[in-house]
Amino acid sequence: GIFTLIKGAAKLIGKTVAKEAGKTGLELMACKITNQC
């Protein structure tokens, strides 16, 4: 029902946020290593 829908949406949003955060984190680490910040 509606609860499953909300749970599915939350999981999808969580995945997207985690992916974006991971990408940003990697870019931050890379620029720190190369002193390009």
UniProtKB/Swiss-Prot annotation:
InterPro entries: Antimicrobial_frog_2. It comes from the Eukaryota. Belongs to the frog skin active peptide (FSAP) family. Esculentin subfamily. One of its GO terms (biological process) is defense response to bacterium. Has antibacterial activity against E.coli and S.aureus strains. It is found in: Secreted. The keyword Secreted applies. Pfam families: Antimicrobial_2. Keywords: Amphibian defense peptide, Antibiotic, Antimicrobial, Disulfide bond, Secreted. Expressed by the skin glands. Disulfide bonds join C31-C37. One of its GO terms (cellular component) is extracellular region. The keyword Disulfide bond applies. This is Esculentin-2JDb.
